[in-house]
Amino acid sequence: MSAGSGAVREEIAMVTGYPGTDKMIAHVMVTTQFELDGYRVVRTLGVVRGIVVRSRSIFGTIGASLQTILGGNITLLTQLCEKTRAEAFDLMLRHAAELGGNAVVGARYDATEIMQGVTEVLAYGTAVLVEPVRPA
């Protein structure tokens, strides 16, 4: 366990309402489908989610505005979106691990502009416990 992981668990608990976990979450399988090929659902554990609310800084807004003049991909906003989605995804996986799940099925993202320049990104799905299907 790395130094400061207690602080991370406390932050997760404060932000999400569920306790942080020391469990490894890298093994959690995620799919947008409602089943995983080669696995069977042993138990459905419930809806899991990760929510991140992010605002753009004044510098990011100015930089993005300049990029729009030139046209093309607005890399500053693309990077911000990717980082925010990754954080929401990680929180969803942590929630699934805390419930004892090793997979998330029906995974989705949603984004809502809460107010000017402030966006909520939600990653959600159903936490399940799966096991490999054994050939008969």
How would you label these PLM feature ranges?
Residues 33-36, 109-113:
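Short, solvent-exposed loop/turn elements at beta->coil junctions and helix N-caps
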Residues 48, 53, 61-108:
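Short, well-ordered alpha-helical segments
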Residues 2-58, 119-136:
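N-terminal presequence-like segments and the immediate start of the first folded domain
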Residues 66-67, 112, 120:
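Short, flexible coil/turn micro-motifs enriched in small/turn-prone residues
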Residues 116:
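Short glycine-/acidic-enriched loop or helix-start segments at secondary-structure transitions
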